[in-house]
Amino acid sequence: MRKQWLGICIAAGLLAACSGEDVQQKTVSVPQPAVCNGPTVEISGADPHFETLNATANQDYERDGKSYKIVQDPANFTQTGLAAIYDAEPNSNLTASGEAFDPTQLTAAHPTLPIPSYARITNLANGRMIVVRINDRGPYGNDRVISLSRASADRLNTSNNTKVRIDPIIVSQDGALSGPGMACTTVAK
């Protein structure tokens, strides 16, 4: 009885394979719109606008023996982990984008998100959210996923041990906003 069923299944599979057209199917990855399963919240922070990517800051790289690959599709990226606070003096360092670091700006450093880009950062302890501009690389070697400027950290009410979620915001050339950072979110103007 088992042999008969096996034979029937094989024959059915062969017939199904022969009956269709000889067309190869390709899987195409189309970014899906951000899904919202709750109320929409208006958040403030950096003003997302289209900016040309910095060619030198967006190359895959290696640091301290570890390889970093720049995120090519931020629409399919989200990350959760601990935040660091970048507390340097104003104008004391240049960022990876070539700008002078300013702790009063709503900026952040991330090891692999495109520069410049924008992201919604959520403090998972208190639910606060802001938009930051990613303009630098880091943090490195301290198990942190993002380094926030002092202004960003203060707005989120974070410490160096606060768990956050990073959701990129994609800005198209016409200024339209999309991506994971726009789910249930509008950006205050």
Which sequence ranges carry the predicted segments?
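Sec-dependent bacterial lipoprotein signal peptides
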Residues: M1-C18
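Secreted/periplasmic proteins
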Residues: C18-K189
